[in-house]
């Protein structure tokens, strides 16, 4: 039995990974590398405890340097993580976990127990497999998974989650074929966890009526529309949940941005591309009581595959959103509408004084390529166009909007995520108190407000129209994975050069 509470103090930790000092060829060397970062986690837990925190979430890929990963090295770092459905497990107390092969699992279990704190940690999990009976079983006869592990405040493993949609991780991880929510009880209510491109779990949130999500992430920002704090706050607002989003802090790959979000907006967030260090965020969350919806859950087992005629835009080849169809806003006040196919985006607006930069209404209805997946998006946006080119990174905002109403017609699904992003002193920020959102009326700013608008966005993910590229997994790394890694590094280099310019 978990005694309910009226509020709960929680934390997320945005961590800048400490790379290993030497190459990893043994389990001992792998543990040395892991401990460099788990020691920092311990410091964050101690600081959190001093602030009254009852639960902390750590980021995806927070324990190891992604730039040095191979299947062999991940094998050295992986541990077998128990599933709670197979019985009670407390690695801190139980003798079978007092071995080198379970050292990190035991470390985190004891960390949670000794500090009376719930914890969610991302690590490498392993499962043995048989090639004779399991077609997906690699040559090394084991499945390595990108894994979230949740511990309660007594150190028990209360949830385990394997990642389904890999994001250029096929060189070291396997994709889980069993999509399921990992759920556990806390004093504030039931929690769930997932990560990164497994972000379609809004349907499962509604199926299980979960109102609190722990979300470890390694979020690569794609300005100006698909950045971490925009997407995470939009998800929390639409799904009516508390979202604890912890991203790794890796500036060279534009990977950063964490926060604690509620149905009312951001309780606290951190989005600083200019500060190369870790950050602890603490806030209080409240219980959320929402009646379970009656809508039918989308079936993920039967995706709609694109035809050869479909124009699939590759987000990471492009690195921008210039492929949207845009229509410029030319008068101080008015209405602008732009359509693609049968999907139309419409903005009614008024600016203070005059436009000091170019703004436009943009629309997109189609597939976007990301990693091993084609993801179907509908996008309706009002956005600044730096140097008169829309869809590029925005560095400064001087135009203030006195009024904005953004809505769209032709949605293919009701899962529409709203965000309203402003820019103060050249830094992107969230201001949840200046706007409202309803499914019928879209985004509308409140009377008497004037904001330096970065972008207002309505983004729908049409999960039933997603498709897989069917990337083949093998061991050792095959040519396709090498090509993907090269492609990713080219994107990283381009993003770094662009950010520095």
UniProtKB/Swiss-Prot annotation:
GO terms for biological process: bioluminescence. Its EC number is 3.5.-.-. InterPro entries: Biotinidase/VNN, C-N_Hydrolase, C-N_Hydrolase_sf, Vanin_C. SUPFAM superfamilies: Carbon-nitrogen hydrolase. The modification S-(coelenterazin-3a-yl)cysteine is found at residue 390. Signal peptide: none annotated. Residues 20-287 form the CN hydrolase domain. It comes from the Eukaryota. Keywords: Hydrolase, Luminescence, Photoprotein, Potassium, Sodium. Photogenic gland (at protein level). GO terms for molecular function: hydrolase activity. The active site is at residues 60, 163, 196. On the 2D-gel the determined MW of this protein is: 60 kDa. Monovalent ion-dependent bioluminescence photoprotein. Displays an emission peak at 470 nm (blue light). Trace amounts of monovalent ion trigger the intramolecular oxidation of the chromophore, didehydrocoelenterazine, with the emission of light. Belongs to the carbon-nitrogen hydrolase superfamily. BTD/VNN family. This is Symplectin. It comes from Sthenoteuthis oualaniensis (Purpleback flying squid). The lineage of its organism: Eukaryota, Metazoa, Spiralia, Lophotrochozoa, Mollusca. The gene is sympp.
